[in-house]
Amino acid sequence: MAEKRTGLAEDGAKSVYERLKNDRAPYETRAQNCAQYTIPSLFPKDSDNASTDYQTPWQAVGARGLNNLASKLMLALFPMQTWMRLTISEYEAKQLLSDPDGLAKVDEGLSMVERIIMNYIESNSYRVTLFEALKQLVVAGNVLLYLPEPEGSNYNPMKLYRLSSYVVQRDAFGNVLQMVTRDQIAFGALPEDIRKAVEGQGGEKKADETIDVYTHIYLDEDSGEYLRYEEVEGMEVQGSDGTYPKEACPYIPIRMVRLDGESYGRSYIEEYLGDLRSLENLQEAIVKMSMISSKVIGLVNPAGITQPRRLTKAQTGDFVTGRPEDISFLQLEKQADFTVAKAVSDAIEARLSFAFMLNSAVQRTGERVTAEEIRYVASELEDTLGGVYSILSQELQLPLVRVLLKQLQATQQIPELPKEAVEPTISTGLEAIGRGQDLDKLERCVTAWAALAPMRDDPDINLAMIKLRIANAIGIDTSGILLTEEQKQQKMAQQSMQMGMDNGAAALAQGMAAQATASPEAMAAAADSVGLQPGI
C-alpha cells in the first residue's frame, strides 16, 4: 500500500471529486441548456447513453453558428502554418548581435524545433481533439485536455474530458489547485493486479462491468509542483504516481470566458442564449402555423345544390351541376401575424449571425465582391472574438506548447533548451494569424519609408527619427535593419576608399594611354604588356 498522502490529497480522489461536484452542477445545467438549442448531443445528461434520441431544435441557426464559430477558431488558433515560435530572450539576442552568424544558427535551430513540434502535433491527430475541444468550449465553456507522455514512435493522441467528467479548483488568481478526472473503464480492461485488488475490496465483478477510475492532480505545497495518482475503489493504484512542473502539467483545464473568483468558465453561447430561446419559440410557432395553413380544407354550403360527392369523383374536364357560391376554402387570414413573427425572427437571426461570425450576415450579395470587402468583413467579425483569442492563447496554446517542449525534451526528440533564454510565443487573432503577418508588417514599413523620399532635402526634418518611429509604431524590431552611426561611418569610409581606388585606376589608365600614344614604339610595348599584338 502507498503511504498516506497529505495536503489536498488527504481525503482521496473520489472524496474530492464528490465534494467539488456540487460546485460544478450549475455549470453543467447551463451547458445542457446551451446544447439544447444548438447540438444536444455535444453535452448530454448523465442519464443519456448511445441509444438516446435527442430532440432536434426547430431552428438550425444555433447548430450552424456553433460549427462555423468552432471552425473559425480552429483556423485562427491552429492554422496550417506554424502558429507558435520559439524566440530567444531580448538580452540573449543583444549579446548575439555582434555575431550575426551565431544568431542565424540559433534561429535555424529554433526553427527546426518548431517543425518537430508541429510534425508531432500533426502525426498524433491533435487537430481532431482540438476541434472537439473548441466545440465544447463554445457550448459548455469548459474542457480538460490530457497530453499523454510520448512512448517512442507509437501513436499518442490527446484525450479530452467533458465538463461532466472532471472537477477543478482554482485560487483567487485563477491558478489550478487541484483536478480530479473520472474514467469509466470495463473491469476486464484493468490490469490483473488491479482486478484482484478490486475483487478483494468489493467482491467478484463481471468483465463488462464499468469501474470508475479517478485521477487526482494536485499542487504540492512543499515542492510547488503538481503530484498525480490514480484511485480505484478507494485504493491508490501502485505505480500511477507522477510529478509535473507547475508550468508544464499535461492536464490542461481550459475556459472560454473566465470570471475572477470562479473555478469554471462561462460559454460563448450562454451570452446569446436569450436570442436562441426566442428564435426557437418563434420558429416553432411559425413552422406549426405554416403546417396548419398548408392544410387544404374545402367548405360546402349545406343548403346549396352542389354535391361534394360529385366533385370528388369528377375528372379533369368533367361537368358537374352546382354553383361556385356553394364552394369555398378555409383560410386562416393570419398573414399580418405571420409578418410580425417573421420580421422578429429575421432580426434575431441577423444578430446571431454576427455573434457566430457568419459572413453572410454582413457581406453583400453580388457577382463581384472585392477582396477589400471580404477583408473588412473578416476584420469586423474577428473583433467580436478579440478577448476570446487572448484567453485561449494563455489557457490552451501556451500550456500546450510548454508541455510538448517538456515531453519531447524528456524523450530526446528535441535538444535541451535553456528555459531562461528560450521563450515560446503564440500568435493568434488579427494581429498575427501565423507568420504571414510579419511579412505584412515589413511591407507596410517599407512602403511608409518609401513615401519619405520627397522630404529628403528638407533641412527641418530628421528622416532617421521618422523611420524609427514608423517601425516602432508598426511593431518591427529595427535591429539589423536601420544602420547605426558607427555602421554609417564605416560604410561611408568604404565608399570613399572605393571611390579613391576607382579614381586612381582611371587616372592610371589615362596616363598609360597618353604615354602609349606618344610614339609607335611605346604603343607596341603597351600592347605587348597586356598580351595584344599590334595591327590585329
From Swiss-Prot:
Q: Where can this protein be found?
A: Virion
Protein name according to UniProt = Portal protein
**Free-text function comment from the UniProt entry:** Forms the portal vertex of the capsid. This portal plays critical roles in head assembly, genome packaging, neck/tail attachment, and genome ejection. The portal protein multimerizes as a single ring-shaped homododecamer arranged around a central channel.
Q: Which InterPro entries match?
A: Connector_podovirus (IPR020991), Portal_prot_Caudovirale (IPR038995)
Leader sequence residues:
none
Its organism's taxonomic lineage begins at:
Viruses, Duplodnaviria, Heunggongvirae, Uroviricota, Caudoviricetes
Top-rank taxon, per record: Viruses
Q: How does it assemble?
A: Homododecamer. Interacts with major capsid protein. Interacts with the tail tube protein gp11. Interacts with the terminase large subunit. Interacts with the internal virion protein gp14.
A GO CC term? viral portal complex
By sequence similarity, the record places it as follows: Belongs to the podoviridae portal protein family.
Biological process GO annotation list? symbiont genome ejection through host cell envelope, short tail mechanism; viral DNA genome packaging
Record's keyword terms, sorted: Capsid protein, Viral capsid assembly, Viral genome ejection through host cell envelope, Viral genome packaging, Viral penetration into host cytoplasm, Viral release from host cell, Viral short tail ejection system, Virion, Virus entry into host cell
The protein's predominant localisation is virion
